[in-house]
Design a protein with these regions (language model features):
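Conserved NTP phosphate-binding and transfer environment spanning the P-loop NTPase/kinase superfamily
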Residues: 21-160
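Conserved nucleotide-sensing/catalytic segment adjacent to the nucleotide-binding pocket
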Residues: 1-16
Length: 160
């Protein structure tokens, strides 16, 4: 079984302590993708798909509700981002949402990807790097999605 390395708390939910304790002692495989691939994946999964979910629930208020959802999510990490980074990313996010509202999808997508890239480089990547340095002794494999899938397909569960 492969699981994403998570903290015990995930939003308002939490992983059972015994399960999380076992996860924290288990070997790790690192999925390594380019920055652009990660930006594209996050855009598709968290922006495009989430917006479609908002539209399917209530089309007339989807833009406003989705905008509030994104801006509130960013606000929750404002203190950790720092004032300047927060304001810069928030400004780009608001521009992206406005372009989407005006049906300028190409510009909206480019702006969303711009703030996603800044958030990855300025916040998430340094945080993950710090966490992975603490867990480096447990890492048994690193590779791209294709490499990782190939490696995993040849594993003998008794060896891991």
């Amino acid at each position: 079984i492969f699981l994403e390395d998570e903290s015990r708390a995930i939003g308002s939910l939490s992983i059972p302590k015994t399960f999380h304790d076992r996860m924290s002692r288990s070997p790790m495989a690192m999925l390594e993708e380019s920055l652009q691939t990660r930006v594209d994946t996050i855009y598709t999964d968290y922006i495009y798909s989430n917006f479609q979910d908002f539209v399917s629930r209530e089309a007339s208020s989807a833009h406003e509700e989705f905008s509030n959802f994104l801006l509130n999510s960013l606000q929750r990490i404002q203190r950790r981002l720092g004032g300047e980074k927060y304001l810069q990313i928030c400004s780009i996010m608001k521009q992206a949402l406005q372009e989407g509202y005006q049906q300028n999808q190409e510009e909206a997508e480019a702006l969303h990807k711009q703030w996603i890239k800044q958030l990855l480089q300025g916040y998430y990547d340094p945080m993950y790097e710090y966490q992975m340095n603490k867990k480096s002794s447990r890492i048994i494999y690193r590779g791209s999605k294709e490499e990782l899938l190939s490696w995993a397909s040849h594993l003998n569960p008794k060896e891991v």
